[in-house]
């Protein structure tokens, strides 16, 4: 996951988003420590990239999670973000769709901002593991997560079909926006 997180952080930085990683390659903070870090940093969003394991080698697939409990309390922005990311990833990968689900896990519960956990397959499944070992697949996942985040901020301008919005498209939009921003501020 470290390599995938670095790929995503690089793409985020290239499109004007600051990415703070809660761990280094040689560390593994608890979910409570990650939540405390995000809260102290004043992050706008938290993305947790994760792979799963199961006793059954047949368990496979992709799922996204946001905060929500059985009493109807949910993070509406987290739910929307999880949905955008999930749709982008399922349309770009051949992974089994396990859906978007609400949970009360520590990281989702303790953060003060929308938080999404992305479960990108099972290391115990040969097909999922093979995909995760492929750098090109990790690029596809990083692009899908980035586009999902950008779609959250493009609501009302969401005119491109799911799975077709690329890193190059996002970068071009950001560059075009930067070029028009000075012209707008000069008119003020």
Task: Identify the residue ranges that each predicted region occupies.
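Active-site-proximal helix/loop segments of hydrolytic enzymes
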Residues: 2-188
């Amino acid at each position: 996951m470290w390599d995938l997180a670095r790929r995503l952080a690089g793409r985020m930085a290239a499109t004007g988003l600051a990415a703070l990683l809660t761990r280094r390659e040689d560390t593994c903070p608890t979910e409570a420590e990650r939540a405390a870090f995000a809260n102290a940093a004043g992050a706008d969003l938290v993305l947790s990239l994760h792979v799963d394991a199961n006793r059954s080698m047949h368990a496979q697939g992709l799922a996204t999670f946001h905060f929500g409990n059985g009493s109807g309390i949910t993070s509406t922005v987290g739910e929307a973000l999880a949905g955008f990311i999930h749709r982008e990833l399922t349309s770009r990968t051949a992974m089994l769709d396990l859906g978007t689900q609400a949970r009360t896990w520590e990281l989702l519960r303790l953060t003060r901002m929308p938080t999404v956990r992305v479960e990108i397959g099972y290391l115990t499944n040969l097909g999922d593991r093979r995909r995760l070992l492929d750098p090109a697949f990790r690029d596809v996942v990083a692009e899908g997560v980035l586009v999902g985040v950008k779609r959250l901020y493009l609501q009302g301008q969401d005119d491109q079909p799911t799975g077709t919005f690329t890193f190059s498209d996002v970068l071009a939009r950001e560059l075009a926006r930067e070029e028009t921003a000075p012209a707008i501020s000069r008119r003020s």
